[in-house]
Amino acid sequence: STRVRSSAASDVYKRQACAGGALMDLGVYNVSYVVGLFGSPNKVHYAANITRGIDTSGVLTMEYRSFKAVSINAKDSSSPARYIIQGTKGYLLQKSTANFCGGVTFHPYKGKEEHFNLSAGRPRQAAEFHAFARAIESEDMELCSRMLDTSVAVSRVLETARRDAGIRFTTDL
């Protein structure tokens, strides 16, 4: 990506000891997106392009009971961000990164497309910060618990995926 190439510390991601591969650095956003929407997958597979023990890019497949979710993470190339969720009645298209859900368009197989944008004109993380503030103010421990459960689920997917690809960290037992 441009970010990696232009970084003064661009060699850091290439060192295995830094554990800075594409999956753990960039894939966390994609996995959080998918797990946040659909929960934990039943099976995980990561096909990685590995250079010097670090994945510079890869394809992550998360299998659910009735569908599969596929995510591509890359530090060795770049392309426009696209998120597509396909269903039996049409598909949703998001043309922004996973960590910023901007506009989403529903493209039905029959009928007129619909566009949704709940963050139009607001700072990128405004909705997230407002949700955090509401949870803190109302002491919503149930929400906090669900968010922690999601974080643990995301970590498990990432850990399973990297081990599946044979990526080992110096801290692994």
Give short role names for the model-derived ranges.
Residues 5, 27, 125:
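Short, conserved glycine- and acidic-residue-centered signature motifs
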Residues 134-173:
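C-terminal helix-rich "cap/oligomerization" subdomain common to oxidoreductases
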Residues 30-103, 119, 130-138, 172:
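Contiguous beta-strand/loop segments that form the cofactor/metal-binding neighborhood of enzyme cores
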Residues 1-13:
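Single conserved hydrophobic/aromatic residue that forms the stacking wall/gate
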Residues 117-130, 146:
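Active-site loop of classical SDR/Rossmann-like NAD(P)-dependent oxidoreductases
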Residues 11-40:
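Mid-domain beta-loop-alpha active-site segment that forms a flexible
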Residues 17-24, 114-123:
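A short glycine-threonine-serine/GTX helix/turn-capping micro-motif
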